[in-house]
Regions:
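Conserved, well-structured ligand/cofactor-binding cores
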Residues: 2-496
Length: 496
């Protein structure tokens, strides 16, 4: 094992630049450099000598030629995988299940990878059969071969440092992988919440800026009653803050781990002290409240927490998409639409219509929301498809939610920086719309009564005359009293 030699074309170890989105599973690698031979229970394979991954990774590369979206494209997952391996090594060292020097070396190598080293060695596609076994085995191989290198041995010389006996000690894919997936999602969720807070504040800032801009509110796309543009934008911030609370509440739930459960939750091959020690070390390494699940068999078979997170992300995406619908509608025009607000011009909007500018930022956020909705449907189906003591479909759950987290985070950022921060109000147009709207008559009902208000509203619609003038002409109020009643703070019930 580990002997290096040269061979002809080797089996396919990766995907070529041209086979995404359509991959040709019969394609072979053009690699002709030095290789080493590794063996497993199925036989032997030649592995590129310089690769840190090994035979289990090579088999998975051949078995799952589905996508070029490799594990290396999910740095949060790579970082989470090695954090879990660190916690396992520290727990094994504590209980005497592994030599202290080996445990320390695992921790050292994992820290290198956590800080960005060897991420390009995580070559497997994120979608795979086997409930994540290939990902776990590949991680073990990369850590073991880097450890061998640091010890002065040849990669693949597993007699000195073994991917399973050492790196995977006291673990199964069925506890190490789901714990890593949860941790990766928490990493992504923390970043999402940071951007979410900034976007929420951006809407509230606009609410303060537009506090004195009166407009007509609408229900069912029909003119309703006056409000301020500031109230409208502040409401956007409020609805986002509610989602922030719901998403934040999920983090402690994600920190319930089944480490120590091993294969199905019975803890076979793991010392009885390992589970608590592993969770404790993971909590110390991450600063997160990781604890051991009270029922490890249930925790190994159940994936409901992923559906909770995905559903909450969908809720946040749908609500933000509705806000983007409003931004597009309020900015429609510029001459023949609502034209109440101006979105920052980001790029030319047409190859045939000069001067056209489209609301491209809200549009892309809408599309992210559509994708998140689809991802949630995928997660729901995958969670339902679990059988007996394990759900085999966590890889698609992981890829779906991690993509949703990343895309939503990016959409929050671009919406804030490239749209919300630069929105301006068309104050003159809004004032003219308020002056010509019959909706303001509602504000005068306490003075003139409903019946008189209804008559004047009908007259205004028939003649086009402003409500203000009709009220004065009817002798019901003076211009001064009408203007006082139509002050922004009274129209919007915001004070005064």
């Amino acid at each position: 094992m580990g002997m290096v030699h040269t061979t002809g074309p080797a089996p396919s170890f990766g995907l070529s630049d041209g086979d995404d989105p359509i991959f040709n599973p019969t394609a072979t690698s053009s690699y002709t450099g030095p290789v080493r031979t590794e063996s497993d229970s199925l036989g032997s394979m030649d592995i590129p000598a310089e690769a840190y991954w090994g035979i289990h990774t090579a088999r998975a590369l051949n078995n799952f030629p589905i996508t070029r979206r490799a594990l290396s494209n999910y740095p949060d997952l790579v970082r989470a995988l090695v954090r879990v391996k660190q916690a396992a090594a520290l727990a094994n060292k504590e209980i005497g299940a592994i030599d202290a020097d080996k445990a320390d070396l695992i921790v050292e190598v994992c820290e290198e990878i956590y800080n960005g080293a060897l991420h390009d060695e995580f070559v497997l596609g994120v979608l795979q059969g086997g409930a994540g076994t290939s990902t776990n085995m590949s991680t073990n191989e990369i850590i073991a071969n880097r450890a061998l290198e640091k010890l002065g041995h040849t990669k693949g010389d597993y007699d000195h440092f073994h991917p399973i006996d050492d790196v995977n000690r006291s673990q199964s894919t069925n506890d190490a992988y789901p714990t890593s997936v949860k941790l990766a999602m928490v990493f992504g969720l923390q970043r999402l919440l940071e951007e979410h807070s900034l976007l929420t504040q951006a809407f509230r800032n606009k609410g303060a800026e537009f506090h004195d801009v009166v407009k007509i509110g609408r229900t069912q796309m029909q003119d309703a009653v006056p409000m301020t543009l500031g109230q409208e934008f502040n409401s956007f911030g409020t609805t986002l803050s509610e989602d922030h609370e719901r998403l934040s509440e999920i983090i402690p739930w994600m920190c319930e781990t089944n480490l120590g459960a091993t294969a199905i939750g019975t803890g076979i091959t793991a010392d009885s002290r390992y589970a608590e020690a592993a969770s404790r070390h993971l909590a110390e390494l991450t600063g997160l409240p990781f604890v051991t699940a009270p029922d490890l068999i249930e925790a190994t078979s159940d994936t409901g927490i992923f559906m909770t997170l995905s559903g909450t992300l969908k809720r946040a995406a749908v609500k933000l998409s509705k806000i983007c619908n409003d931004l597009r509608l309020l900015s429609s025009g510029p001459q023949a639409g609502f034209g109440e607000i101006n979105l920052p011009a980001r790029q030319a909007g047409s190859s045939i219509m000069p001067g056209k500018v489209n609301p491209v930022i809200p549009e892309v956020v809408n599309q992210v929301a559509f994708t998140v909705i689809g991802a949630d449907a995928t997660v729901t189906a995958a969670v339902e498809a679990g059988q007996l003591q394990l759900n085999a479909f966590e890889p698609v759950i992981a890829s779906s939610i991690l993509q949703s987290l990343a895309w939503m985070t990016n959409s929050f950022r671009t919406l804030r920086l490239n749209c919300v921060d630069g929105i301006t109000a068309n104050r003159d147009r809004l004032a003219a719309m308020v002056a010509s709207s019959v909706g303001v008559i509602t504000a005068l009902i306490p003075v003139i009564g409903y019946e008189e208000a209804a008559k004047l509203a009908k007259q205004a619609l028939a003649t086009g005359a402003p409500i203000r003038e009709l009220v004065v002409q009817a002798g019901l109020m003076s211009f001064e009293d009408v203007d006082a009643a139509l002050q922004p703070e009274k129209l919007s019930n915001s004070g005064g």
